[in-house]
């Protein structure tokens, strides 16, 4: 642990905090229909899109209609992406002559990108054409991110409105999220990445001769445009198999910093949007404060674990920390910070190999996902995931004082609590259920490259990542099989829709309620006491649910390593 490392972490936190208010103010104006500085340019385009699509932007939807639109949007997106992948060999922009993607892999990949997971059981440069990368994956990166933002805004309206039968229009929300938020940032962001050295070309792969005379093919493509939205939209899927560790995706320390900032930018700013739309910015800062506490704790543990290395490494005199699987241009601090950021959000991009982290260093990214990625989280998904925990925390506070729980003037009743618990419990069902299955069937046991607790963690990490819609992986798992492609895809679908649908049900229920004036007995939800309660509820639920699985994996691995015990490679 070095002063330079701490400065990097502090600088990152300061930049993200500095963006919260201006970006939050801008997005509030976008989603409340107010005029912005981009309205003169984008307004005519927006209205033109509505006319072509037959959408009345003044017609709002009941929560059931909003939910139906969300599901339909995903179904259509899946069908288009699946068709592109299966027909890849006969479609244009395929200079490397990539063949059609296999049915099970196409199913997994299509599910992955429409759900904002971006799990990849393949290497992009050896599997996909430029058309598949652009029209298929990059396109869905925009739409899946916009969908998450739209659902979060719908839930905010549920808290902000009173006696209302509608929560907005999905078609308007997803259009504005794409047109006014994602695209205006991604265009200059892409140009910045090109300046940093990331390729953006439709030219064929380049053939090169090394200094030793060997022939080498250098993969190229429209990389910068995909990297920009994969980071900003917390999608995470890499153009190349090495993801953000590849020098063509993340070549410099500056590009690394900007990419890390962009992962958190929208998610952090949405807490400010929440505060502004409910009429009390302190509410947003309280939620961001809870997120910040959990994030900082994760960074401290991961940085400490990686900087101190493992007892096995230290026994060989390697006392410089754990550099295995890390890029020297980033070092331990930036790699540990990136790992916590990408799993606190639902991004999943990596600039180091998580499978090569120490046992405790790998535990934190795993735990971040198991908590539901509510520490900033994915664009939109992080906020509505955290608000689910807020509802549970308010319910617990109400039980302790014997009062009907209230939040922002809305009574939290049985329906909201049931929907919140459904959204929370569907994740461990997928994460732990499929992990248990994979450890007892031959097709599952054939996947991990390592024996013992680390092999178990590789399986647990995969299903946790899929259900949490993260997409990062312990790379030692061979996942491109019928068993893993199918079960991981099911986990992604349940993790996406069995959270979104309860969230929209909560939004509709709250929007229809009247606002109750605050009284002397109302529990304040903008101070330190509430932040502490919220953090406690998150850790208790996460700890009770996932501690047994963590004990079987990274905890046992750490204790065994401290005792000098290692496990042979091989599942």
Swiss-Prot record:
The chain crosses the membrane at residues 5-25, 64-84, 136-156, 179-199, 254-274, 285-305, 330-350, 357-376, 421-441, 488-508, 527-547. InterPro entries: KdpA. The keyword Metal-binding does not apply. GO terms for cellular component: plasma membrane. It is a multi-pass membrane protein. GO terms for molecular function: P-type potassium transmembrane transporter activity; potassium ion binding. Keywords: Cell inner membrane, Cell membrane, Ion transport, Membrane, Potassium, Potassium transport, Transmembrane, Transmembrane helix, Transport. Part of the high-affinity ATP-driven potassium transport (or Kdp) system, which catalyzes the hydrolysis of ATP coupled with the electrogenic transport of potassium into the cytoplasm. This subunit binds the periplasmic potassium ions and delivers the ions to the membrane domain of KdpB through an intramembrane tunnel. Belongs to the KdpA family. The system is composed of three essential subunits: KdpA, KdpB and KdpC. NCBIfam families: kdpA. This is Potassium-transporting ATPase potassium-binding subunit. It comes from Methylobacterium radiotolerans (strain ATCC 27329 / DSM 1819 / JCM 2831 / NBRC 15690 / NCIMB 10815 / 0-1).
């Amino acid at each position: 642990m070095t002063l330079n490392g701490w400065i990097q972490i502090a600088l990152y936190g300061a930049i993200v905090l500095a963006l919260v208010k201006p970006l939050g103010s801008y997005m509030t104006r976008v989603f409340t229909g107010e005029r912005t500085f981009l309205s003169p340019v984008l307004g005519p385009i927006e209205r033109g899109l509505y006319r072509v699509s037959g959408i009345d932007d003044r017609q709002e939807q009941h929560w059931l209609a909003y939910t139906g639109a969300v599901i339909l949007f995903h179904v259509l997106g899946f069908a288009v992406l699946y068709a592109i992948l299966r027909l890849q060999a006969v479609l244009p922009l395929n200079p490397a002559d990539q063949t059609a993607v296999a049915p099970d892999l196409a199913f997994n990949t299509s599910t992955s990108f429409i759900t904002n997971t971006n799990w990849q059981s393949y290497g992009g440069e050896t599997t996909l054409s430029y058309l598949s990368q652009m029209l298929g994956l990059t396109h869905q990166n925009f739409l899946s991110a916009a969908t998450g933002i739209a659902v979060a805004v719908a839930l905010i309206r549920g808290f902000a409105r009173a006696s209302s039968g509608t929560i907005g229009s999905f078609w308007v929300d997803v259009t504005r999220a794409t047109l006014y938020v994602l695209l205006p940032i991604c265009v200059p962001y892409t140009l910045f990445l090109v300046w940093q050295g990331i390729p953006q070309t439709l030219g064929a792969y380049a053939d090169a001769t090394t200094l030793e005379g060997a022939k080498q093919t250098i993969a190229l493509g429209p990389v910068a445009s995909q990297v920009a939205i994969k980071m900003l939209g917390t999608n995470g899927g890499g153009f190349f198999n090495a993801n953000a560790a590849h020098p063509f995706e993340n070549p410099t320390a500056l590009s690394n910093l900007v990419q890390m900032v962009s992962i958190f930018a929208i998610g952090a700013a949405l807490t400010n949007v929440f505060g502004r739309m409910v009429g009390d910015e302190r509410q947003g800062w309280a939620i961001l404060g809870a997120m910040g506490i959990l994030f900082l704790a994760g960074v401290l543990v991961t940085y400490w674990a990686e900087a101190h290395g493992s007892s096995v490494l230290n026994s060989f005199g390697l006392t410089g920390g754990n550099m295995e699987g890390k890029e020297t241009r980033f070092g331990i601090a930036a790699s540990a910070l990136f790992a916590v950021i990408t799993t606190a959000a639902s991004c999943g991009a990596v600039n180091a190999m998580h499978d090569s982290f120490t046992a405790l260093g790998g535990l934190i990214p795993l735990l971040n996902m198991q908590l539901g990625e509510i520490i900033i989280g994915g664009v939109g998904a992080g906020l509505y995931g955290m608000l689910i925990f807020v509802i549970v925390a308010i319910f617990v506070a109400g039980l302790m004082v014997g009062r009907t729980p209230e939040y922002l003037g809305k009574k939290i009743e049985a329906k909201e609590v049931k929907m919140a618990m459904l959204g929370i419990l569907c994740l461990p069902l997928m994460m732990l259920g499929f992990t248990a299955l994979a450890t007892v069937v031959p097709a599952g046991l054939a996947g991990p490259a390592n024996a013992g607790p680390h092999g178990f963690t590789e399986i647990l990490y995969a299903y946790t990542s899929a259900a949490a819609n993260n997409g990062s992986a312990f790379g030692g798992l061979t996942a491109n099989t019928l068993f893993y492609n199918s079960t991981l895809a099911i986990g992604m679908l349940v993790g996406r829709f069995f959270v979104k649908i309860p969230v929209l049900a909560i939004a509709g229920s709250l929007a229809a309620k009247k606002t109750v004036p605050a009284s002397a007995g109302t529990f304040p939800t903008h101070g330190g006491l509430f932040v502490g309660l919220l953090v406690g509820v998150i850790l208790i639920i996460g700890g009770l649910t996932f501690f047994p699985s963590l004990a079987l994996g990274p905890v046992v691995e750490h204790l065994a390593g401290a005792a000098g015990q290692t496990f042979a490679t091989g599942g």
